[in-house]
From Swiss-Prot:
Annotated organism of origin: Shewanella oneidensis (strain ATCC 700550 / JCM 31522 / CIP 106686 / LMG 19005 / NCIMB 14063 / MR-1)
GO cellular component annotations of the record: NADH dehydrogenase complex; plasma membrane
Record protein name field: NADH-quinone oxidoreductase subunit K
Transmembrane regions listed in the UniProt entry: 6-26, 30-50, 65-85
Record's function text: NDH-1 shuttles electrons from NADH, via FMN and iron-sulfur (Fe-S) centers, to quinones in the respiratory chain. The immediate electron acceptor for the enzyme in this species is believed to be ubiquinone. Couples the redox reaction to proton translocation (for every two electrons transferred, four hydrogen ions are translocated across the cytoplasmic membrane), and thus conserves the redox energy in a proton gradient.
The enzyme's E.C. designation: 7.1.1.-
Pfam family, one: Oxidored_q2
Membrane topology: Multi-pass membrane protein
Keyword set, alphabetical order: Cell inner membrane, Cell membrane, Membrane, NAD, Quinone, Translocase, Transmembrane, Transmembrane helix, Transport, Ubiquinone
């Protein structure tokens, strides 16, 4: 039984990355920005796994573990900053917070 072709996996990773990039550029809510960054990081992790499985190397899975640990750290720090900004400014809009800075 054969697996998914590499082109299909990389196409899916590229589509996910583009969706995350569009969300990052279009949305102004900090929660949606963090979710878009998570989608982009997962897309890059998927590309590593697909490329690693193509050449039967464990390097892709090792990079996946590193990307997931980086994503977990980014999510925890991002959510902590999100809570602090919401408590201080009562909004999650990035433009409003930057205008309030003075």
């Amino acid at each position: 039984m054969t697996g998914i072709p590499m082109e299909h996996g990389l196409l899916l990773a590229a589509a996910l990355f583009c969706i995350g990039l569009c969300g990052l550029l279009i949305r102004r809510n900090l929660l949606y920005i963090l979710m878009s960054i998570e989608i982009m990081m997962n897309a890059s992790a998927l590309a590593f796994v697909v490329a690693g499985s193509r050449w039967a190397q464990a390097d892709g899975q090792i990079m996946y573990i590193l990307v997931i640990s980086l994503a977990a750290a980014e999510a925890s720090i991002g959510l902590a900053l999100l809570l602090l900004l919401y408590r201080r400014y009562h909004t999650l809009n990035v433009d409003t917070v930057s205008e309030m800075r003075g």
